[in-house]
Amino acid sequence: MAKKANRHHENGRAAAATSAAADGKQPARMKTKDYLREKRRLDADLVAMQEWVKATGAKICVAFEGRDTAGKGGTIKAITERVSPRVFRVVALPAPTEREKSQMYIQRYIPHLPAAGEVVIFDRSWYNRAGVERVMGFCTEEQVAFFLKEVPEFEQAMVTSGILLLKYWLEVSPDEQTRRLESRIDDPRKIWKLSDMDLKSYSRWYDYSRARDDMFKASDTA
């Protein structure tokens, strides 16, 4: 990825180091009162940012990736619950249709990119190819290699067009992932979150770690 886009991206190597450390140990939890206090402050910041986006015509694209149960959906819900759906839009695409499979891989994501005055949040993104699809065998290694080669150019084109691109990887430790999956199984209010894919991916922890690290290296801007 060109250095010009660097100011709009998280540093890949730093993210890789952080997530690799999380493989072994889960960070300490915040106390509920501290979390609620901080969230109120951040909600106010988000509302202020929303007004800035509307006033300036900014285009913001946020991509959330991470392991299953890492908290992507919950994080996105927390971000969007106090802002306007006219400005903030969440994109969570289903499995590709047969027609989409025949198209250029990145094509299905392009119509969802933000216009002026919009914030678009992807709950999983084009990085599916480097993560889920690779680990679960839904694409070939040749397709993964091509994607990792082309994605910096795609993202550079986004940035050049005026889109502010932010990418986040959410990590979870093996023990915490086990606890969260068991919670979904045992709680009828959460069972809808559990899929066959969750259970299959659970057994492929190190495959996901390797895919994650390869993804960081290929999309690093430093």
Show the residue positions of the predicted features.
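Glycine-rich phosphate-binding loop of ATP-dependent small-molecule kinases
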Residues: 1-222
